[in-house]
Design a protein with these regions (language model features):
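Extracellular, repeat-based ectodomains that mediate carbohydrate processing or recognition
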Residues: 1-351
Length: 351
């Protein structure tokens, strides 16, 4: 009961069913919904961490072996934590404190984003509110008992709205994030797993700030980055054809926020379907609808706006994923009912 799904992240289990980590706002708990079938008409709910304020920021990743990992913020102590599920439904779980904060006076772990290397080691990018830095935690084993903590970007207030992925070929971290000091959306491509060496690029000068960032690398290694431009009040898409996103970059304005500047098309999530089309979920705060931008061509000059759910205030904190068969799954928060929802698209266009 209460406000569940306020923050959520979706993955796919070893069986190919949706699995969602989420925050129960009233209770302050971190929970997991394990869908027991492909359409999630039946789900097992697991209580993962409680008696505090857990999971306000959370992300989930499933390794090649099917092991499930969940990164999240402990707001009571200000710590970054990682859960490793000990069975595929996460009925048993191991909790590790990765980086310690100083309570509510100084969080580490906001905007955390997790991915798993091909060797099964979790890598977590996150914002350190103590130092206002972008940080990276690299687990040195699959249990995440031991980890190396790196301050990756320390120039100004950097690391909010972070999203992380691992390069398809090199398995090295790629991080997209906000540089609030310089009012830019930035990209870092690590040259090694520990990010001792990296290339840094400015994706966009956004004059105020760029928020709600989502990153995806397709099978041809093209990078796609969606974000909200709070200056121009646009949901935007950056397409990077070169490795450092400097020489061959395209910026597309997708939708303009005409009614409520600054907060209109927020909480976006991005994937590329198995036909090579970009899909970006968004919340329309004017209509309170939840929808998708579907790109009909490579640079999204031709696009369609598709409504997914439009009864109530729905679609915040969305997370989207597709499986090897092209099926698309989206978890999102329905603030009218205070509930977590899952949508499964019946085709790769979600219409």
């Amino acid at each position: 009961d209460g406000l569940v799904g306020y923050a959520n992240s979706i993955g796919l289990s070893k069986e190919g069913f949706p699995i969602i980590s989420y925050h129960h706002l009233n209770a302050g708990d971190l929970k997991l919904a394990y869908c027991e079938n492909i359409d999630c008409s039946s789900a097992k709910i697991q209580l993962l961490d409680w008696a505090g304020d857990f999971g306000y920021f959370t992300d989930i990743a499933v390794g090649n072996s099917g092991k499930v990992y969940i990164s999240y913020l402990d707001r009571k102590n200000g710590d970054l934590r990682v859960i490793r599920c000990l069975d595929y439904k996460c009925g048993r779980a191991q909790i590790n404190v990765i980086d310690k904060g100083t309570g509510k006076a100084g969080y580490v772990g906001e905007y955390n984003s997790i991915d798993i290397t091909k060797q099964g080691h979790p890598v977590i990018g996150y914002f350190d509110n103590n130092f206002n830095n972008l940080k990276l935690a690299i687990c040195e084993d699959t249990d995440c008992y031991r980890s190396v903590i790196k301050h990756v970007d320390t120039e100004g207030m950097v690391g909010e709205y972070l999203d992380l992925t691992l390069d398809n070929d090199t398995d090295m971290p790629i991080l997209a994030y906000q540089d609030r000091t310089n009012m830019q959306v930035k990209l870092i491509r690590c040259s090694d797993l520990y990010c001792d060496n990296y290339e840094s690029s400015i994706i966009d000068d956004v004059a105020k700030r760029g928020g709600d960032i989502s990153i995806f690398q397709d099978t041809s290694n093209t990078l796609y980055i969606s974000y909200y431009d709070f200056n121009l009040n646009y949901l935007k898409l950056a397409i990077c054809k070169d490795s450092n996103c400097n020489e061959n970059k395209t910026i597309i304005k997708l939708i303009e926020a005409k009614i409520l500047p600054g907060i209109f098309y927020s909480w976006n999530s991005l994937i590329v379907n198995n036909s090579g089309n970009v899909l970006i979920s968004f919340y329309d705060m004017n209509t309170n609808n939840f929808g998708i931008v579907y790109c009909d061509d490579e640079v999204c000059e031709d696009k369609e706006i598709i409504n997914i759910d439009k009864i109530g205030k729905i679609g915040t904190y969305a997370s989207m994923i597709s499986d090897s068969n092209g099926r698309i799954f989206i978890s999102y928060y329905d603030s009218s009912r205070g509930s977590l929802k899952v949508a499964q698209c019946e085709n790769n266009k979600c219409n």
